[in-house]
Amino acid sequence: MKIRPAEARDRERIHEILVATAHFTEEEVRCAMELVDQAHDEPEKGDYFVHVLEEPDDGPVQGYVCHGPTPLTDGVFDLYWIAVDPKQQGQGIGQLLLRFVENEVRRKRGRMLLIETSSKESYASTMRFYERSGYDEISRIKDFYRIEDDKVVYCKKLTPS
């Protein structure tokens, strides 16, 4: 498997993965795709970086990740989106994508990676994934997204490489 910058040809597959996960609302999928488009259309801005993980020899894309620097901070980055084809989940693809982003952040002299997620029951495995990956829950805003759906913020401090 290899991780590479997303290209225009990956857009449809990224959309398919987001829809197939069944975690995201239509509005969330639209938001995620806006970041994919912005990363592709305005790379010089450096606001968003999108990468895909594909099988060797240009095989199908199995997952994608989007991250970028947090505005008005020194060395803080956000993981905006991470999604893996549901048929491929549990095979370490999410872990590979997350470690890739951590290494990219270190390479860019980043010191902290933040992840925001929902507290909905359907996200329980996602939250366990972040915790197993060394992220600490640092904030929880009750009823942020909607009643009984908190915003949970995870953080991992990184040592720049």
Stretches found by the model and what they are:
Residues 1-2:
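Extreme N-terminal starter segment of soluble prokaryotic enzymes
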Residues 92:
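Conserved G/P- and acidic residue-centered "switch" motifs that form tight phosphate/ATP-binding loops
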Residues 105-118:
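Conserved GNAT acetyl-CoA-binding A-motif
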Residues 48, 149-153:
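Short hydrophobic/aromatic beta-strand or adjacent loop that forms the aromatic wall/cage
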Residues 24, 85, 89, 121-122, ...:
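Glycine-/small-residue-rich active-site loops that bind phosphorylated ligands and cofactors
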Residues 115-126, 144-148:
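Conserved beta-strand-loop-alpha-helix junction that forms the acyl-donor binding cleft
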Residues 129-130, 135:
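Conserved active-site tyrosine of GNAT-family acetyltransferases
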Residues 5-87, 95-100, 104, 108, ...:
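Acetyl-CoA-dependent GNAT
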